[in-house]
Amino acid sequence: FLAVWLASRHNVPCGGPMGSPNPSLRMFTCSKTYRDIPFAHRQHRHEGHCSFLHGHNWAIEIEFGCERLDERGFVVDFGGLGFLKLWIAENLDHACLFAQSDPVREQLLKDYPKLFRPLVIESVSTEGIAQHLFETFDPMVRQETAGRAWVRQIILHEDTKNKASYQPKA
């Protein structure tokens, strides 16, 4: 009602109760959160305590988007996201993330091969990990949904007090 009234007062086209008059401009979203994922990292460029190897209990919030819901009316079927849960279990659970540029990474992994479950990525800041997760999960979701749905954003929680997000520019 409000949209129709505003449109009549300001000569603006109205999309009716569904919003945009162009269905391709609509987007549905939903999100799934995976909690209590223990893994470690070290910020080798940090001047403080974060330069030491340390761990957190992380949570990964994945926001999905689509323009057209599936035949059940879902953006994604939460029960069908086992491929993401498996990737998290195999790559992050009790892992140690190292930045590609960390000067001690190679030596540590060589000297202590059984001490670490390593994952080497470009940046191990919370922001960098969020970007890595986006770049990993988005192609997986697109493949699983035949391109109908995608990852819109990753919000990565470092314990309960800090978080960072990554989403590509529109």
Residues covered by each model-derived region:
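Charge-rich, low-complexity N-terminal segments
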Residues: P21-A170
